[in-house]
Amino acid sequence: MIEVAFAQLRLAASLALGLPFSPRSLNRIIDSLQATRCEFGAIERSGAELVQGPTLDPASLREIHLRRFRSQARRAAKETAYYSDLFGRLGLDPARLSWEDVERIPFTPKSALRERPDDFVRRGARPTLNCTTTGTTGRPTNVCFSDYEMQTYIAFNAMGHLVSGDLGESDILHIATSTRAVLGNICAIGAAQRVGALVLMGGLLEPAQTLTLLAQERSIPGKKARTSALLAYPSYLGELVESGRQLGYKPADFGLERIFVGGELATTGLMARAQALFGEVTFHEGYGMTETWPCNGTVCEAGHLHFEPSSALIEVCDLETGAAVKPGEVGRMVVTPLPPYRETTLLLRYDTEDLVQTLGEPPTCRLRHLPAFSRLLGKRRLAVQCDAGWVYPRQVLEALEALDCAPLPARCGFWAVAGGVAVEVVARDRTATTRRQIENTLEEQGAPLRELYVHTERSQLRQPLPLRGDLKELSFSGAGGAQTVDRRSAPHVEDEYAEPMLISTF
């Protein structure tokens, strides 16, 4: 008991003062949370505060952010090639930065990290893992992490699962993400194993193969009869829904209870159509990117994207001027990962290119104590400025994925034309009824539609939005791998499947 109390004090000191985390203390806290959940079945609010830190008023949080930013800026100016040169040119003392000085520091563009990744690695760091992004929306970038950082991320993920109860010892978690998404996969696998769940790293197989694995009955002692949790990109989840529909699957064929989605925009229509296939599953929608890890967000029941404030300074800046936006306005997320979470690849005011809308009113949701914005609107370079204003990928995707006439995931593109935007989309047919449905839903989402091109083949698209689900991987066939079953033609067949051997094509 004394050791656990000391570990809690050690964690509180790290969260409050920015001191390095103690891996031993984090592990003791995880053990304590596991014991509490086993005995009482749930973690009280005090347990959540232990992981997130105490709720701070805006003034106190702003003071802490400035102090942590100075600390990170000092290390960056002293120990990285990129920021040493930058602060020299700006003539700023990183130890004495004011908020006005912070605003003078230019955004760190993705292009700089992509072209000179080693210039951001701190000379005093001990990197042990070099992660690349998947490169879905551009050439991959490289980010280095230390063993301390990885242990910390896994520990906090595990504590998050234990506090929320969204993953436990009896669960079977199927991960359907690209095997190139090393950072997210390592953290997801490590945290799941730490809470005792069984992990199956499926990767991005052909959807029919993944459906077979999800429907497979298991008889592992202490585990549920079927896969109970799925981690997937929204676009790949859409492919699973579409394939499941074609193969005749029903909710009774699965045991899914929770679906974790991230890496792309998840729409209301996608989740509703996924529930039609898998049953009344609970969705956990998150946000995270390799460059700014562990600045990860979660979407609440009211549709707000919330962030734990101690891990990073998040600014929402105007698309044109770069100044801070006003409440209710749209801007780009500019993120500075802070100590004690980041010590290897240091990034100050990193331009994520992700667009959000600030909230016009204080939230009243379950996570109202955490900073929040709207759900992601999409990448800046994928948004379109037209005569009628900005049109964002979320508007188009929310409209299309709500329609059954548009196969999942929505295959589409859009661009500016006189008076608004032109939209192209793959649909099941090109009838007048389909066109009217698409036109109406786009207008309901506020898209100033002027031209609509309805196709029935992906190859006909001129400017398609990129999808992570297209980063497909291959498996050996005919060697004990999972076989695809059409539930309509063979409803009574009982099959045994082995886990597939993966070959990455990237």
Regions picked out by a protein language model, each given a short descriptive name:
Residues 76, 133-136, 173, 230, ...:
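Conserved S/T- and glycine-rich ATP-binding loop of Class I adenylate-forming
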Residues 147-160, 172-238:
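AMP-binding/adenylate-forming
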Residues 169-170, 256:
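Phosphate-coordination loops involved in phosphoryl transfer and adenosine-cofactor binding
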Residues 174-175, 334, 424:
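Short, well-ordered beta-strand segments
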Residues 209-210, 217, 223-271, 284-291:
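Adenylate-forming
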Residues 230, 341-450, 504-505:
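AMP-binding/adenylate-forming catalytic core of the ANL superfamily
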Residues 257, 266-268, 272-362:
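Conserved AMP-binding/adenylate-forming
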